[in-house]
Amino acid sequence: MTEDCLNGRRTAFDDPYKPGRNALSGIQQVIEAQSPPDLVILLLGTNDFQSVHQHKPWHSTMGISALVHAIRTAPIEPGMPTPPILVIAPPQLDNPRGPIGPKFAGGDTAARGLARAIRQISEDAGCLFFDSNTIITSSKHDGVHLDADQHHALGVALAPVVADLMADRDGG
């Protein structure tokens, strides 16, 4: 398992203040470096709704669609399998507040319908989908991030999903 989180990462958009936050710009190299991955899990979209962007769910899902395409067309060695992709809708922003509040001002309104839009783009692209909103909420402290208990609950919920995917992939 390889984890590749980066604070502030967007699906396919640049951060005007912090370079290197565009997931699309490096995803193919990550796939190639980790080839062949058994599964790719994408949990992105929250940062697409920072106040520097005027995005709606459609924009974020176009970023996810571009990531899926990039993963499937990564320059891996001939004969290596293309991994299945599990797309996870992030929890809905909930009244961003505290020091991070201005950074996400209006994001909770702009992101309404994101999970539904991600579900649709995932189905259209033949990706697996999981809605984290069925298990967790955004942080009680800032309305944006996940608190430790949400991380744990999401991990517990995803463990059997991933185990089943790996068993199916391995023919078991």
Give names to the regions the model predicted:
Residues G20-G172:
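Alpha-helical cap/lid subdomain in secreted, periplasmic
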Residues M1-F13:
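A short beta-strand-loop structural module common to alpha/beta enzyme folds
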Residues T11-N22:
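Structural motif
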